[in-house]
Structures are given as structure tokens and as C-alpha cells.
Amino acid sequence: MSERTKRSVGVLGAPFSKGQARGGVEEGPIYIRRAGLIEKLEELEYEVRDYGDLHFPELPCDEPFQNVKNPRTVGQAAEKVANAVSEVKRSGRVCLTLGGDHSLAVGTITGHAKVHPDLCVVWVDAHADINTPITSPSGNLHGQPVSFLIRELQTKVPAIPGFSWVQPSLSAKDIVYIGLRDVDPGEHYILKTLGIKSYSMSDVDRLTINKVMEETIEFLVGKKKRPIHLSFDIDGLDPSVAPATGTPVPGGLTYREGMYITEQLYNTGLLSAVDMMEVNPSRGETERESKLTVNTSLNMILSCFGKAREGFHASSLRVPDLI
């Protein structure tokens, strides 16, 4: 990567909620910014360009397709995100997308792949989000984005309204899941049939997060260096540290494990795009829970950009000599 790519970040807000049923997740971007995101990235010596928030008009009469809800609204929003992410990547910046619900990963990854078609993905989540429109129990598109992206699944994914623009950009060997603990039967079948590398929380417990990250990095970029896209659903973390999200699942990654994942991805020097998804301040039962979730998401983001738990100092800092 160029020096500018390593030290320059483009922040893109995606305040969108129609991939699932719970309102409030569209407020994620503004809350994360208010927590000091831009200033803290600048303290890490990044040149930051804030591209602002995308606008997502709600389409009237967006009838379900079979049981898939809001297909045209979600498809249009994801396409807008894809175009915006491509613009950020063409500028040479690392792209940070603030969601919004996880259906938008169809857009973030497709947009990234337009510029870096050899990318790979680390997907941190309690859920696999790889249901097809046919296997999805709920019909919510935030549980389906990966199915649109995987080439080996395209004979299983029907043409649904709003998604004709999507071209699959990943093979099954290009993605690794970390943190799974609520996987639907159809998703489990897909993961096992395609041999997609995934680490459930049982695997994390058994191997430790250090081994999980060693294996993940070796699998994705050990033989060939290529851009890494981190798509981070905040519900990958345990509800004790990130309660304000739409579908929390007990028994998740600890704060320390989340930090270790992001630190190790930063240390590769290959992290090219980051999604922070499903932060929903309205789902906190108290103001403290909402603030805790926002601050946790902020710290995960900053760790992606080099904030180390051991401390940090500006390159210009000097301890003055006594006169």
C-alpha cells in the first residue's frame, strides 16, 4: 500500500435500518462521530476526510419478494454505498463505513472489490448472515448479505428486485468468520458444504483468540498479500460490553478479544476497509448501556487504525532536555 493509503482514512456514514425491523440503528453514525471519532483518528496522525452521511430515500410500495422484506429499498441503499466506497478507495484512503444495519455489507464489499478485486474479508459477528432469500427464516436482508457476494452460491440466490446490479465478488475461500454462536440451519449447511472457514465461540474458547488470528491471517494473506476488508457487527461482542444492538447473543467475544482481532489486522498493514455495523443506541435499556456500546465500537475502530493498548505517542513528540 502507498504511504497515503496507510495514513489516510475516509469516513462514510450509512444511517440505514431497512435491512431489519428495529429502528434506531440508523443513528449509529451520528453517535459514533459525537463520541469523538474524527478527532481521535487525527490524534493517531491520520489525514481524515469525512464524506458525511449518505441519504437513503424510502421507496413507496416496496412489496416483499416472497418473504424478503424491503428488497428494493435495501438494494438501492446498498448500491449507493457501493458507489461511495469505491470513491473512497479510488482516493487511496482506507474506507471506514459506519452503519446502519449489516445488509449494507453487500454494498461495502462490492464497492471495495471494484477497486481491489483480490480482496479478502474477515467477518466478526454472532451470526453468519449467509442465508439466501430462500433459506432465511425472517426475510430480513441484514441476515443475507454474504449470500449475494459468494460466487459459489449464485445458483441458490434468486433474482430479487433491487439487486440486479450486484456481481458476486468473493469465493468461499476469501472469507473467514469469527465469533459465530447463532447460526441458522440453512447457514450451517452452506458453511459446511462450501468449506467456509469459520470460528464459532466454541472454537475461540478452545483455540484462544491468538491462535484464531494466527490461522485467519495465514489463511487469507499468508501466501499472497492482498487487501483485507473487516466487516464488524457489534453483536459479535458479548452483550456485557455491547448491549445496544438489535440481535444481541450471550456468550460473545470479550472486549479484549475484540481488541486483539483489530490490533492483529492493523498489524498486517493490509487493512483496506472497515465496516462498523449494527450499533443501535436506542436498544440500550439505559443511557449507560447506549454509551457503553458506542464507546466500545469507537475503541474497536481506533484499534483498527493503530491505537495500541500499550499507549501511543505522536511521531513529533520529544522529551525536552534540561537547560
Curated annotation (Swiss-Prot):
One of its GO terms (molecular function) is manganese ion binding. Mn(2+) 2 binds at D125, H127, D233, D235. PROSITE patterns: ARGINASE_1, ARGINASE_2. Substrate binds at H127, A128, D129, I130, N131, S138, G139, N140, D184, T247, E278. Pathway: Nitrogen metabolism; urea cycle; L-ornithine and urea from L-arginine: step 1/1. InterPro entries: Arginase, Ureohydrolase, Ureohydrolase_dom_sf, Ureohydrolase_Mn_BS. Its EC number is 3.5.3.1. It comes from the Eukaryota. Gene3D superfamilies: Ureohydrolase domain (3.40.800.10). Keywords: Arginine metabolism, Hydrolase, Manganese, Metal-binding, Urea cycle. One of its GO terms (biological process) is urea cycle. Mn(2+) 1 binds at H102, D125, D129, D233. Pfam families: Arginase (PF00491). GO terms for cellular component: cytosol; nucleus. Homotrimer. Belongs to the arginase family. This is Arginase, hepatic. It comes from Aquarana catesbeiana (American bullfrog).
